[in-house]
Amino acid sequence: METNDRQKSWLKVWGGRLLNMIFFFCMLFVVYLVSGVFIVTSFKIPSDSMEPSLQTGDCILVDKCSKGARLFDVFAALEKKEVKIHRMPGWRKFKRNDVLVFNFPYPGRWDSIAFDVMSYYVKRCIAVPGDTLEIKDCHYRVKGHDGYLGNTAAQDKLQKLLDSEEFVNRGIVVESYPFNKELGWSIAEFGPLYIPAKGSVVEMDSLNRMLYRNLIEWEQKEKLTFKRDTVLLGDSVISRYCFRENYYFVSGDKME
């Protein structure tokens, strides 16, 4: 009888300890999941586009509190379905030169915006909502901002390359968005481009129709079409447009 009592006592003690350990590790796992969704998560740099600041394979910690965590249906996202995203309140706005992790808005094609929320890019913020951005001689410029923007050493290097005899003699011009030969924007001379802020209004002239068509169609889920001098959003005639979201201009640090 005494032996049985000892065995029962031993099982009770170690059974309780085992349950406590299981509970402890379950709580750790829950804390890990919650912190990864709402507070901070790790991200591995997938390419060399941020060199020399960040190297391929580097792991960085992404602060989710500053802008606010995003909540969405993970299972739908894994199936490559379009998901509705709810963003929690944040405590500060993104600033110029911040390093941002985001979803690339053109995963499949260049003429329309879409998002794969399970695929991430990392770039440096050059312009924030409400800024007017230009590129002059390969260097970023924002109206009213006198500080540096991006990796100026890489911009100097790119300018020297494009001004080299080989490029000049061949007449090489590297076009950039919106890839319109009449407009003539390139990676060396670009803009001015207004970066839309939530609530800002633009006139639907020929230039703005070209620059902001993708953004407008993504926000409204309607096609923006042109008939002579008339702009149609779906079946409605519009002469100006009020943006629903804030937008940012980002770039890699490496320019080669």
Region spans (language model):
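N-terminal signal-anchor transmembrane helix
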Residues: 42-53
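Soluble "head" domains of membrane/secretory-pathway proteins
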Residues: 2-16, 51-256
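Cytochrome P450 fold signature focused on the C-terminal beta-domain
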Residues: 41-42, 127
